């Protein structure tokens, strides 16, 4: 499989090279809108009908019972439990460190302003199932929700045709203290959390990855006054490597990204043409040892190897592209990292593969894709809170800023605003 190599492209060519795979269509929008409407109107009945239609699953009880949870946890090997436990510990440590103290400041005499982080009461987590049940995502979403103090955490995940949820997903959920787990997947699960059904409660904010139907459902959920973590598209990695980089490391980073899905995109940026020319062969050699080769090949088909003149150009390209994952596999990694302003998560040095962040380093793997890192952050503790501001003014405090408020209100022709100050100051 040959990855396209582009040498020294002019800046006018960059937008073409930066294009992501986009699958937004009117048909997709309409299909999801129909699912949303069906769930809104028919509730649990719609969830059962849609599970049978799309997944061939005959659903019984939608909720995972305590007995099912225990049975699933008993099935998880001790080795995997230990791995999940270590990952959970690191993720919890990093997210606990993000706690912010309440802010209080006197802006002028007698005027006190405060800001307090308040947890979102009820959040919904979507965990994909299918061929790659993402139990790691349970940790990435469930642990911050618990640390933030969300009192109600609802989780939806599809079950298999045997009616069972993946055992590792349930073990990870128990690790996070999640007990409200429902057997529902796809766009209909998002609809259930956005609208509420007889069994699944409506939530205030929805988190989690998924296919294009899930992503479209999350976008449409916002019409129902439900917040989402972020817009999302296919996963992506950008690798910056110098002439000293081990090609096996670079190739394995390409391949680990490519196995996320056929629309995933991997990009190498380098100023070393010789490295760029050798990389495709190493990719092919490692690919031959892996499963899912056909899907990986599709992903590599719209991936890029790009040779640029200077590191300044490399950084400009990185910041213009705004990658979900950025690997700096080069001697200048720390210096370059300080110049990165648009990226979801950055991995410094040869021993920092994306896989570490995907699972166990402690950072969150729910990150902005498709260029949204220009403005969005990855999921963090703040994602599960809202910031409420408070102000307390004494009479003297109001007197101190009263003339300013009255003058500004009058200039905006909002005379009732002016009056609200004047009556308090006996004017």
PLM regions and their residue ranges:
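Flexible, glycine/charged-enriched surface loops at secondary-structure junctions
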Residues: 100-107, 227, 264-269, 289-299, ...
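Conserved NAD(P)+-binding/catalytic subdomain of aldehyde/semialdehyde dehydrogenases
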Residues: 177-265
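A glycine- and small/hydrophobic-rich beta-loop-beta segment
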Residues: 256, 260, 268-343
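N-terminal Rossmann-like NAD(P)+-binding subdomain of aldehyde/semialdehyde dehydrogenases
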Residues: 1-121
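Short acidic-hydrophobic, aromatic-tinged amphipathic segments that line or gate anion-handling sites
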Residues: 2-9, 180-185, 305-310
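C-terminal core of ALDH-fold dehydrogenases
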Residues: 319-427
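Conserved small-residue-rich beta-alpha loop and adjacent elements
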Residues: 105-171
């Amino acid at each position: 499989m040959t990855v396209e190599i582009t040498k020294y492209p002019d800046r006018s060519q960059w937008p073409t090279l930066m294009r992501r795979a986009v699958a937004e269509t009117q048909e997709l929008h309409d299909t999801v809108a129909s699912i949303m409407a069906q769930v809104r109107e028919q509730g649990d009945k719609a969830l059962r009908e849609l599970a049978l239609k799309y997944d061939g699953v005959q659903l019984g009880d939608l909720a995972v019972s305590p007995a099912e949870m225990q049975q699933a946890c008993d099935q998880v090997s001790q080795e995997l439990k230990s791995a999940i436990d270590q990952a959970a510990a690191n993720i919890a440590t990093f997210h606990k460190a993000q706690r912010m103290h309440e802010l209080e400041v006197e802006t002028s005499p007698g005027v006190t302003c405060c800001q307090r982080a308040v947890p979102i009461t009820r959040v919904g987590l979507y965990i994909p199932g299918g061929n790659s049940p993402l139990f790691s995502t349970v940790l990435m979403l469930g642990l911050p929700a618990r640390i933030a103090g969300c009192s109600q955490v609802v989780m939806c995940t599809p079950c298999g045709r045997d009616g069972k949820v993946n055992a590792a997903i349930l073990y990870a959920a128990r690790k996070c203290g999640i007990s409200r787990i429902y057997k529902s997947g796809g766009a209909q699960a998002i609809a259930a959390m956005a609208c509420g059904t007889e069994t699944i409660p409506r939530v205030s904010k929805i988190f989690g990855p998924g296919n294009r139907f899930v992503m479209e459902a999350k976008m449409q959920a916002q019409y129902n006054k439900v917040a989402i973590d972020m817009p999302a598209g296919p996963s992506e990695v950008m690798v910056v490597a110098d002439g000293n980089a081990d090609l096996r490391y670079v190739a394995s980073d390409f391949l680990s990204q490519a196995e996320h899905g056929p629309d995933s995109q991997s990009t190498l940026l380098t100023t070393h043409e010789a490295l760029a020319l050798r990389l495709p062969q190493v990719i092919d050699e490692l690919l031959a040892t892996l499963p899912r080769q056909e899907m990986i090949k599709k992903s590599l088909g719209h991936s890029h190897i790009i040779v640029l003149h200077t590191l300044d150009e490399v950084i400009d390209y990185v910041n213009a592209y705004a990658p979900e994952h950025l690997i700096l596999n080069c001697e200048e990694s720390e210096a370059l990292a300080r110049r990165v302003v648009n990226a979801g998560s950055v991995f410094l040095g040869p021993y920092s593969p994306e896989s570490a962040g995907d699972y166990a380093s402690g950072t969150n793997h729910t990150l902005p894709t498709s260029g949204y890192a220009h403005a969005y952050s990855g999921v963090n503790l703040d994602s599960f809170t809202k910031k409420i501001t408070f102000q307390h003014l004494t009479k003297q405090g109001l007197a101190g800023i009263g003339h300013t408020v009255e003058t500004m209100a009058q200039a905006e022709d909002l005379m009732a605003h002016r009056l609200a100050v004047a009556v308090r100051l006996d004017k």
